[in-house]
């Protein structure tokens, strides 16, 4: 469960390592984001020669949360931390690699590229 001011790790090779959620997209009263939701983020720490710089604003999709996601069969998938993948204005991933597992909940038409790049789909 991600809200404004939540910090997330970055699960791609854009050069960013940590981002700060500045807005949950999807309505003015929307407070929380879960796996598969798009958020607006600010880069808080980045590698010196990466594609992104500290202070840049991007869209991102949440790929892992410590809160987890409930499946229809009753199982709960949780992770050790919160992670996101940076997106451009067309909601396409900026990076060319994804690190760590992602969940099956991302298998929509919008995020099939992320699922195909991920090393493991849980």
Curated annotation (Swiss-Prot):
Which keywords has UniProt assigned to this entry?
A: Ribonucleoprotein, Ribosomal protein, RNA-binding, rRNA-binding
| A biological process term (GO) from this entry | translation
Is Nuclease tagged as a keyword? no
Cellular component (GO) terms are: cytosolic large ribosomal subunit
Cite the InterPro entries for this sequence.
Answer: Ribosomal_uL14, Ribosomal_uL14_bac-type, Ribosomal_uL14_CS, Ribosomal_uL14_sf
GO function terms (MF aspect): large ribosomal subunit rRNA binding; structural constituent of ribosome
Sorted alphabetically, which SUPFAM superfamilies does this protein's record hold?
Ribosomal protein L14
- Recorded family membership: Belongs to the universal ribosomal protein uL14 family.
The record describes its quaternary structure and partners as: Part of the 50S ribosomal subunit. Forms a cluster with proteins L3 and L19. In the 70S ribosome, L14 and L19 interact and together make contacts with the 16S rRNA in bridges B5 and B8.
Provide the function of this protein: Binds to 23S rRNA. Forms part of two intersubunit bridges in the 70S ribosome.
Give the protein name, as stated in the record: Large ribosomal subunit protein uL14
Naturally occurring in which organism (per UniProt): Polynucleobacter necessarius subsp. necessarius (strain STIR1)
Source lineage: Bacteria, Pseudomonadati, Pseudomonadota, Betaproteobacteria, Burkholderiales
Gene name as annotated: rplN
């Amino acid at each position: 469960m991600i809200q404004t001011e939540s910090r997330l790790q970055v699960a791609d090779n854009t050069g960013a390592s940590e981002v700060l959620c500045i807005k949950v997209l999807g309505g003015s009263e929307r407070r929380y984001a879960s796996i598969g939701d798009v958020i607006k983020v600010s880069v808080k720490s980045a590698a010196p020669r990466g594609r992104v710089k500290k202070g840049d604003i991007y869209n991102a999709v949440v790929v892992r949360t410590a809160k987890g996601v409930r499946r229809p069969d009753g199982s709960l998938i949780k992770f050790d931390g919160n992670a996101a993948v940076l997106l451009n204005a067309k909601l396409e991933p900026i990076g060319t690699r994804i690190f760590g597992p992602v969940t099956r909940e991302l298998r929509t038409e919008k995020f099939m590229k992320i699922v195909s790049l991920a090393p493991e789909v849980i």
